[in-house]
Amino acid sequence: MIEFDNLTYLHGKPQGTGLLKANPEDFVVVEDLGFEPDGEGEHILVRILKNGCNTRFVADALAKFLKIHAREVSFAGQKDKHAVTEQWLCARVPGKEMPDLSAFQLEGCQVLEYARHKRKLRLGALKGNAFTLVLREVSNRDDVEQRLIDICVKGVPNYFGAQRFGIGGSNLQGALRWAQTNTPVRDRNKRSFWLSAARSALFNQIVAERLKKADVNQVVDGDALQLAGRGSWFVATTEEVAELQRRVNDKELMITAALPGSGEWGTQREALAFEQAAVAAETELQALLVREKVEAARRAMLLYPQQLSWNWWDDVTVEIRFWLPAGSFATSVVRELINTTGDYAHIAE
């Protein structure tokens, strides 16, 4: 298995170095649900600004304030503790009057707005996130500048970030031990983390191998192509390759890579043979995913940060802004810009 730090770069290994997250204010995340609260219903959506608090801790504190069980407070995704983040929490309060949430007090947190909503906010039910990052102590400004320009055109690999695999790769190591021993794992959280790490590592490996090709974004026979921004996909045939390539070049279509698991992976012929060869040595992880009935899926191979802009405060400090769809990693963008000091693994997804 390729170590995360050794995964293939789309733009070559960065020449410069820099510091990511010198302080929480250098990593700002604003959640984008993609919809507005209904204004009625038995749930309350609460938009929180937080600094120095993890999502679960704030959710539990909100439940205590509302005098409801912790399981009645949900959220679309975990946000990093060591960052400034805006996100929505959802509390189910059937039959109760609208509480005064301006009275909710928690160090490092501020209620920005709240409103009634008809449905529970479920994990993953967000459109994306807007990021504002500050990179400090940057060396080789010219290289970073050129990479930002190139990323606007060619994107970055859509790798799962190091945080998916746990500190020191602990989640992936857990998955490997589970695969090798076949010992039942009772802890639901561990099961989820380990299976996710296993599938993500296999995806990363397939993408890393594809990026070694001279023409990375070239459609091959049997590729599974996805409409940009959509989850559905279809298989490319030899007769269609030229037209499909034009649509890929226009970013209308995205080439996908496998999230291996049980069932068919989605690619056929040449593309399927390539993907299978890329992870052929990882028989234990593949068998684990099949045994635990984790269904195979597809994910775009490349990621195009939207609304990408940047501003150099001085020759060694740059502020970068961009928007990413749900499930994508800001650290996968930063990885193509600089060799960072510090460990990505502690950054929440």
From Swiss-Prot:
It catalyses: uridine(13) in tRNA = pseudouridine(13) in tRNA. Disulfide bonds: none annotated. One of its GO terms (biological process) is tRNA pseudouridine synthesis. Keywords: Isomerase, tRNA processing. One of its GO terms (molecular function) is tRNA pseudouridine(13) synthase activity. The keyword Lipoprotein does not apply. Responsible for synthesis of pseudouridine from uracil-13 in transfer RNAs. PROSITE patterns: TRUD, UPF0024. The active site is at D80 (nucleophile). Belongs to the pseudouridine synthase TruD family. It comes from Escherichia coli (strain SMS-3-5 / SECEC). The keyword tRNA processing applies. It is an enzyme of class 5 (isomerase). GO terms for cellular component: cytosol. This is tRNA pseudouridine synthase D. Its EC number is 5.4.99.27. Residues 155-303 form the TRUD domain. The lineage of its organism: Bacteria, Pseudomonadati, Pseudomonadota, Gammaproteobacteria, Enterobacterales. The gene is truD. Substrate binds at F27, N129, F329. Pfam families: TruD. Transmembrane segments: none annotated.
